[in-house]
Amino acid sequence: MNYLPIFADLRQRPVLVVGGGEVATRKIDLLQRAGAEVKIVALALAEPLAAQHQAGQVEWLAQSFTPELLSGVFLVIAATDDAELNAAVFEAANQRHLLVNVVDDQPKCTFIFPSIVDRSPLVVAISSGGQAPVLARLLREKLESLLPASLGTMAEIAGSWRDRIKTRLHSMPARRRFWERLFVGRFASLVSAGQLEQAEGELQQQLVNQQDEQQLPAAARGEVALVGAGPGDAGLLTLRGLQVMQQADVVLYDHLVSADVLDLVRRDAERICVGKRASTHSLPQGEINQLLVKLAQEGKRVVRLKGGDPFIFGRGGEELQAVAQAGITFQVVPGVTAAAGVTAYAGIPLTHRDHAQSVIFITGHCRPDGDSLDWSTLARGRQTLAIYMGTMKAAEISQQLIAHGRSAQTPVAVISRGTRHDQQVQIGTLQELEHLARQAPTPALLVIGEVVDLHHQIAWFGQTTPTVPQDSRPAVVNLA
């Protein structure tokens, strides 16, 4: 992040604008909408600015710029077509540690103006940091069409009730829940329809409901949401998953959850890494189960965020059993499992009419006392094997499949960090699986079957060419 997005209170604060032409006029209009006291330094004024000066709306200093004019100023804008003058304004302001913007000269800016969607008091600011202003403008236009004009009225009503809500709902979590429910419910529809009196009545009813809820024991208010985070690319997170993450009081997450997905969690939610990887846990599974129950019994909305889908080799079922036995309300938000997302990004269809009529999901990390795999069934042809957490067992997997009849030349793929910018796909044969797995960064998915050969034709993610040369050695393809 090259710029920190902040909202400055300019009401009754002096802002100096150097320049009196068309560009200065546009900037001054924006400053006045924010309540700034504008001083213009220019030898002449464009007609709109001259009219504002006559009306007493701006102060005009009809002289050349001197550094002394910066005394007592909050921020500075240079909006002239004189590069030398603009540079002088920048240097003088910078020496005095004043925020300064030289229009259309980013290196001479200590702040920049974003594209704005104005639904005052709700304001959305968009910036590309000066790298792609047209892209920022297009995004603003998109948001203009998506955000209803009634949002401003909704925010004004909320502001008028804010102090009263604080006196009746004493805890921050209770107030947050109240506002979240209010803004997505009937209240929003009434405001949008212009029925403001009815909207305030709905607000009062929701406040009563929230107060009644606060009388319940904490354990009755807490809840757990088991959310699948997908394989890594934040774009694969479900809409429902995002909504639940944005409402969480606390989030328990694994190492497999990508940083991009974690960035979507509500900013002030507590985050606890329980750090699960194959055979390695920051917390034992039993302690994770107990922590989920404990946090929910404190009245918190708990999100258990798991890579992929929580019910596919994620032990999500075990966690929910503990939650259910404690009598806690819960919900499940499915996620894109690694076998589906990672293979799609690698250009490997799990089934194909010519190659595989079935797919089997397998974990390489079984219980030590568990039953052994049915290798005879797994070694059959015309099926795809997708093996989670299998890199440490790659040698055994290869040996057993070959021993039970699968061809040693069966195509295999080891896909590391799938769907992420640093995804790697290693292609080889079943007899080379141990070597490929040893090379692969983790986490990695093993894919075994004839469908792997289609990678050479339809790989698409991050590549400049859809084909990968084949030779007798494993091919390592970096799809970063």
From Swiss-Prot:
UniProt pathway: Cofactor biosynthesis; adenosylcobalamin biosynthesis; precorrin-2 from uroporphyrinogen III: step 1/1; Cofactor biosynthesis; adenosylcobalamin biosynthesis; sirohydrochlorin from precorrin-2: step 1/1; Porphyrin-containing compound metabolism; siroheme biosynthesis; precorrin-2 from uroporphyrinogen III: step 1/1; Porphyrin-containing compound metabolism; siroheme biosynthesis; siroheme from sirohydrochlorin: step 1/1
Catalytic center residues: D254 (proton acceptor), K276 (proton donor)
Binding site for S-adenosyl-L-methionine: P231, G307, G308, D309, I312, T337, A338, M389, G418
GO BP terms in the entry: cobalamin biosynthetic process; methylation; siroheme biosynthetic process
UniProt modified residues of type Phosphoserine: S128
Function: Then it catalyzes the NAD-dependent ring dehydrogenation of precorrin-2 to yield sirohydrochlorin. Finally, it catalyzes the ferrochelation of sirohydrochlorin to yield siroheme.
Record protein name field: Siroheme synthase 1
Organism: Pectobacterium atrosepticum (strain SCRI 1043 / ATCC BAA-672) (Erwinia carotovora subsp. atroseptica)
